[in-house]
Design a protein with these regions (language model features):
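Structural/interface elements that position substrates and couple domains in central-metabolism enzymes
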Residues: 1-168
Length: 168
């Protein structure tokens, strides 16, 4: 992320009669990466200031590779900006292509949102893999347990045993 910031910094200066450039970080990062680390790299390598000379935003990727029931267009897009003007520019960009854009108050909130989504998934996959081991020793079919638990219309989300987290 930071090396990319170094590489794109020289291109941030707006041309005459054009709007400020927009940089949107999409990678999974820890809270503070956009408004501290990336901003520092972009500013120090361009001589420009985020929010004043260029827009800076964060919007986490939310895809589930291999699933065909959700498209990039239909998955709500969490967006944030370094300043309110940066947020507006990010909302304008994604609203042109995404059905639902969900603005949050800061880049840190958006970064923490992505981490929370990933942690939720990781914890539940780890849990169901452990349950599979325990239930097998007890002679219980974990797949049947998950299907039965899935009949509860609230408070349960099925996760299935597998080789790990996957991703890309």
């Amino acid at each position: 992320v930071l090396k990319t910031g170094v590489n794109i910094a020289p291109y941030l200066k707006a041309e005459a009669n054009t709007s400020k450039k927009l940089v949107v970080l999409v990678s999974t990062t820890y809270p503070g990466t956009t408004d501290e680390d990336l901003r520092d790299v972009l500013e120090s390598n361009s001589g420009l200031k985020a929010g004043e000379h260029f827009h800076l935003a964060y919007s986490p990727e939310r895809e589930d590779p291999g699933r065909t029931d959700h498209s990039v267009k239909s998955i709500p897009k969490v967006v944030s900006g370094f300043t309110p003007e940066c947020l507006k520019r990010c909302v304008d960009l994604y609203s042109a292509a995404i059905d639902e854009v969900y603005p949050v108050t800061s880049t840190r909130v958006a970064e923490a949102t992505k981490l929370t989504e990933n942690i939720f998934r990781c914890v539940n996959i780890a849990l169901v893999n452990e349950l599979k081991v325990v239930y097998e020793k007890m002679g219980i079919n974990v797949w049947e347990v998950i299907e039965a638990a899935s009949t509860k219309p609230f408070g349960f989300m099925p996760f299935y045993p597998g080789p790990g987290l996957g991703g890309h």
